[in-house]
Amino acid sequence: MDFVLKMKDKSLKNRKLTREEGLRLFNSNLEELIKEANNIRKEIHGDGIDLCSIINGKSGRCGEDCAFCAQSKYHKTNISEYPLLDYEKIKKVAKENEDEGVHRFSIVTSGRGLYGEEFERVITYYSNLNKELKINLCASHGIINKESLIKLKKAGVKRYHHNLETSRNCYDKICKTHSYEERVKTIKNAKEAGLEVCSGGIIGLGETIIDRIDLAITLRELEIKSIPINVLSAIKGTKLQHMIPLNEEEILRTIAVFRFINPEAKIRLAGGRYLLKNFGENAFKAGANATITGNLLTTCGNKIKDDKRLIENIGMRIF
């Protein structure tokens, strides 16, 4: 049996692919790889696309040194810096997304975490949003303990977002101010608190293909069911400002291999979609079945109406 077909059958039976198999898949025939990744997606998930959106609820002045991030105080970028937004501003954006048919909405805040008065304010925000709107609520507030996560859940949050960013082996090349294990612990805390978890990473940081495969396997081991894949936007003033953008083929290969390794998960297009033709049309044919829509934290995304049109044009549907 052809290797890619053999791996598809293994994936559909939920038998765990090895890193060696993942690497061989990455280097296999592109057309066949994409076709079978798409077949895995169809067989397990059907043709539905999950849409989520975010708001940059607190921007800049972050004390962490993540090499890719425009919000780090270690970088000189031209982003807007502001404290936690007021509730009405956040509610307005959440309501606009709900009215457009977006499934999930998350407040994202800069910094290692959110503490004290700001954390209590955001708990009130979620509680009010949960009462006033129907959109599913997600949260992204950095490294956090289980007690705080339980508070988020009680306030109506269903899912916590916390990316691993890259492999354990590569992590200290992009961040020195906190450890990979702290990120893993946050994910475990969220699961123990009864929250769903959204966690993925960024490709194009200078990592190897093996690093990407190791990330996909770690996410599988953590049983993550929503995996955002960001493609680095090299922002002027950051440590990675001179990184050469990935080409579309490499991005599609990565998405497809993530689908093989994580057949049950939603593979979510996130930052850097502008690097793909028509904001990722081919990615939805390579195993992706979810996307962040609208603007991101410090970069522009695709408009919701344009994403809805794109999804319709490729014969898929928003569920």
Curated annotation (Swiss-Prot):
Residues of the Radical SAM core domain: 44-273
Pfam short name (any one): Radical_SAM
Pathway where this protein functions: Cofactor biosynthesis; biotin biosynthesis; biotin from 7,8-diaminononanoate: step 2/2
Cofactor note: Binds 1 [4Fe-4S] cluster. The cluster is coordinated with 3 cysteines and an exchangeable S-adenosyl-L-methionine.
Binding site for [2Fe-2S] cluster: S106, C138, C198, R268
GO molecular function: 2 iron, 2 sulfur cluster binding; 4 iron, 4 sulfur cluster binding; biotin synthase activity; iron ion binding
Residues bound to [4Fe-4S] cluster: C62, C66, C69
Catalytic activity annotation: (4R,5S)-dethiobiotin + (sulfur carrier)-SH + 2 reduced [2Fe-2S]-[ferredoxin] + 2 S-adenosyl-L-methionine = (sulfur carrier)-H + biotin + 2 5'-deoxyadenosine + 2 L-methionine + 2 oxidized [2Fe-2S]-[ferredoxin]
Highest taxon listed in the record's lineage: Bacteria
GO biological process, one term: biotin biosynthetic process
Enzyme class: transferase
Keyword Nucleotide-binding belongs to the record: no
Keywords: 2Fe-2S, 4Fe-4S, Biotin biosynthesis, Iron, Iron-sulfur, Metal-binding, S-adenosyl-L-methionine, Transferase
Entry similarity comment: Belongs to the radical SAM superfamily. Biotin synthase family.
Quaternary structure annotation from Swiss-Prot or TrEMBL: Homodimer.
PANTHER family assigned: BIOTIN SYNTHASE, BIOTIN SYNTHASE, MITOCHONDRIAL
UniProt function note: Catalyzes the conversion of dethiobiotin (DTB) to biotin by the insertion of a sulfur atom into dethiobiotin via a radical-based mechanism.
Protein name per Swiss-Prot or TrEMBL: Biotin synthase
Organism taxonomic ancestry: Bacteria, Bacillati, Bacillota, Clostridia, Eubacteriales
Gene that encodes it: bioB
